């Protein structure tokens, strides 16, 4: 069934678009049926770390207070169940180590968890930039729990290079708002991969920006024309990355929690 009458009035975000790319049926459950999602370990953990970093950058917590806050609030903030004990222990330890080693920012902070709204074509968008800062130009930073890797610069892009390019689309979309507010595009797009204490710094590229704009609008057009809403079933991803899995009949038929 086609739901263009609902979709055409939507306010878009990077996550809404990528939800459709990951699984059209999940998009249907979340944004057409508007089902409420359930807690998941990876998303809970990421949100918790984002909150702590935000509190530090805004001065609500001092550097010395971060580990204590983390330990005191981890269990009540990270509710979802990890796939196994080893993953839980690694994530817990790496988050604590990052907060113990965190360094004061050297650049001028212009915004933290900055809410943005803008238009792309005729489509309304919203988003949140984890950090907007200025050094020799404007930089935008996304805090990531994923252990992404810096670009290899090989002639033939590796799997991790291609994955990085996909993640960069979020920051390229946010760059529209930066241009609208500051009159210039970001100089750098940065991922703060806090679990591995790795900073990935990519220069803004106008061609990649234009390609991202086209990708976003083309995907929205596909969503507007969608009629089948097919599921994309892969057990681990469905179980631990989809907050609608308990309400998805396809996942239950596939085996569910068995």
Task: Please tell me what each predicted stretch does.
Residues 1-258:
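RecB-family 4Fe-4S metal-dependent nuclease core
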